[in-house]
């Protein structure tokens, strides 16, 4: 995991030099959003999601950045609430720290995009975090845009005697600036 974060930091550091003479702009971009994930699989826990990502927009179609989120979980269906608390010492939250890459399909006010977040969910029994998604960006001005995406989110949960994934179908909305 340390190697992955180091690779992202090196990539962010090197991109300005790579594009310096190509005429493509590099600028700061921030994103903030929230949403809900609906649990699927054997560990079907719904969750509320808050996240923020900050990084660089490279040309009109590529964004790379680092982000953090807060995922608050709740039980669903026949999953007893105590089964999750047993592995999290009563807590229901994971705090994923991740690298984000977004590719915009078009250089227009309204554009589809593909995005992927890969990182680690910080918690006593945290683990790998991944969240690929597809979405649509609606430009609201020269810099501000509304983003709506749909994807899948998985948070690995590890404990001394078990390891399981907490998967969910996620719907998010947010602003990029």
List where the protein language model places each region.
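Residues that define the transmembrane beta-barrel architecture of outer-membrane proteins
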Residues: 26-28, 44-48, 91-97, 110, ...
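Repeated loop/turn-to-beta-strand initiation elements of outer-membrane beta-barrel proteins
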Residues: 61-64, 108-112, 138-146
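Outer-membrane beta-barrel "beta-signal"
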Residues: 101, 165-177
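Helix-adjacent hinge/juxtasegments
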Residues: 75-116
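Transmembrane beta-strands of outer-membrane beta-barrel pores
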Residues: 34-40, 70-74, 103-107, 118-124, ...
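Bacterial Sec-dependent N-terminal signal peptides
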Residues: 1-26, 173, 177
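Outer-membrane beta-barrel domain signature
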Residues: 21, 38-43, 84-90, 120-125, ...
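Transmembrane beta-strand segments of Gram-negative outer membrane beta-barrel proteins
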Residues: 21-38
